Amino acid sequence: MAAKKSTWKKGRGKLGSLQPLLGSWEAESDSPMGKLKCTRTFKLILGDKYIELYARWQFGKGAYEETAIYGINDDVLSFWSFTSDGKKSQGYVADGTDVHPDAICFEANMPAGLARMVYWPADDGGFHWAVESKVKKGWNRFTMHHYHAIAT
């Protein structure tokens, strides 16, 4: 089967860099808790001034959920995240070109230090997503998924 042509085209405006993520996506992976399935849905909300992410991680009998809002704060693309374990975080767009030239990257100061999440295009038309923590020698990747579009 031939590789699917990348649809990783950023849009216009301050939220335009998130255009490639709009829609519903799914990844399956192994984890310390066993097999997991994660779905991510990105959609424009509130007059297209914000993007909402709803993510659900399904681990066997359990689940972990996240709702995040992406928008502009003090002229900087930012996010505010809330999770089903009661935690919250917020961060801002950052440079992720060390991962991929077209990466979409956000950094956040977490209790354990600086962390980032990075999205970048996959050759099959989906995308990769990773979470990394800042260490002395650069970034330590501790989670990575490969997402495919969910057929609608």
Locations of regions flagged by a protein language model:
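Hydrophobic small-molecule pocket/channel-lining residues, especially in calycin-type beta-barrels
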Residues: 1-152
